[in-house]
């Protein structure tokens, strides 16, 4: 309080503003620098090392879009860059979008047929679209199912999917061809196919799948994340242990 003559002046205390915290931008990281994503699928990118608001952009939204929460969605086959801007810096993830699953993905695997020629068993592989076969034979209907497979230590000529995956391929190659959004699961006793003799013989520990409608391609992987078996199935959920046992595969 300052008194001047009869006047009294009250001085308010001076409050210094809080210093603006300095952000260590070297600690700010983006969860992925590169990404493979299937058209129609989504993967969420995350920024760590800061609490500031992040601004997300895609260099080509016709290929992939990104939401304000970092959710990247594949639109069509191609490449784009998703950028996260925060605290004065920009972080970039290169996104490669692969084509969505279609009937073409079931072209190459074919179907194994055994027949006898002059008393000798002859195994052949028919090059027929798996989906076409299932629809023609009625396997695609309610309650129906069908499957065919190839294992590393099985019999017959080694086959491959329409995107080039075969026994011996790496998990990283599967992700490159089908997208990082695929989920890897552990083999379980509850899962019918995980109990197959060939699954155990090849020491498969886990598997991943890609789907088109009611049709699936499953890749069995060993401890080194290499493909040891491929199963193509229609209405896989209808296939139980009793069916595999009756076919002699358990």
Report the location of each language-model feature.
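Acidic/histidine-rich, surface-exposed loop or edge segments in extracytoplasmic proteins
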Residues: 147-160
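Extracytoplasmic soluble-region selector
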Residues: 5-101, 120, 131-136, 141, ...
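Intrinsically disordered, low-complexity Ser/Thr-rich linker and spacer segments
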Residues: 21-25, 158-160, 238-245
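A cross-family detector of function-defining hotspots
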Residues: 102-143, 171-242, 247-250
